[in-house]
């Protein structure tokens, strides 16, 4: 199952992704994103934890204004 990095403040997103069977990695620092297939961030900081510095080869999804279910759909789309 793909590894999904989720910013630690997005607990509802973490729970929703776990319920769908994904391995969820809480993102607290730059190194947490390494090895993740996709990362979900709050978008409060455009360059949160240096993720935009290509720490991860996976997609980065900004959660701003989206529900947990909408984010799960975006994750599934990115992983196809």
UniProtKB/Swiss-Prot annotation:
Disulfide bonds: none annotated. It holds the Pfam family UPF0180. It comes from the Bacteria. Belongs to the UPF0180 family. NCBIfam families: PRK03094.1. This is UPF0180 protein GWCH70_0946. The lineage of its organism: Bacteria, Bacillati, Bacillota, Bacilli, Bacillales.
């Amino acid at each position: 199952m793909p590894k999904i990095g989720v910013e630690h403040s997005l607990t509802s997103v973490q729970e929703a992704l776990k319920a769908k069977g994904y391995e969820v990695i809480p993102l607290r620092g730059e190194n947490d994103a390494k090895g993740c297939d996709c990362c979900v961030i709050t978008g409060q900081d455009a360059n949160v934890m240096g993720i935009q510095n290509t720490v991860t080869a996976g997609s980065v999804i900004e959660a701003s204004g989206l529900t947990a279910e909408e984010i799960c759909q975006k994750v599934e789309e990115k992983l196809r």
